[in-house]
Amino acid sequence: MPPKAHAWVGPSSIARVLACPPSARFSEQFPDTESDFAAEGTEAHELCEYLVRKALGEKVRNPKKKLKFYNAEMQECAEGYAAYIMELYETAKQNCTTTEIMLEQRVDVSEYIPECFGTADCIIVADGTMTISDYKHGMGIKVEATDNPQLKTYALGTLAMFDFLYDINTVRLIIYQPRLENVDEW
């Protein structure tokens, strides 16, 4: 997992800021607290990252022992995500030998939005196509990829990082939300 850092405004809060711009500065006065639901989601992301890195052949440490919220459902969700990401990656590699995959990648968008950065769950870049996938562990609200401000913000930053290396003409945005059986692509 990347170091815990928070932007003044990040991709995960961009929808709120677009709807109410003053909320960006207003929210600074409140402590940055994490609910149990958010902590569970963070741990699910750690497990997802571990399983994808393991599938890629990287030497990684299994995080299960330190996960407070780990259970069979989290394992099943993370395994499904890892299989899905590996399928996307293998398909991209068939079309481009220089395909890049990045997990928990810091994306800087400050060229367009001051002090804006965030961490994208998975970015796959191949000639012609860039795919950004976001894992959602929550089951309270179904998240859609279509016109998703968070994913579009990651796309903006990722294009700035890779457009000079790859001739990107297609951007795929994907939400993977297994507990609601939701895999949505735009």
Where are these predicted regions, by residue range?
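Mg2+/Mn2+-dependent nuclease catalytic core
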Residues: 97-186
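A non-catalytic, helix-rich entry segment at domain boundaries
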Residues: 34-35, 39, 43-105, 110
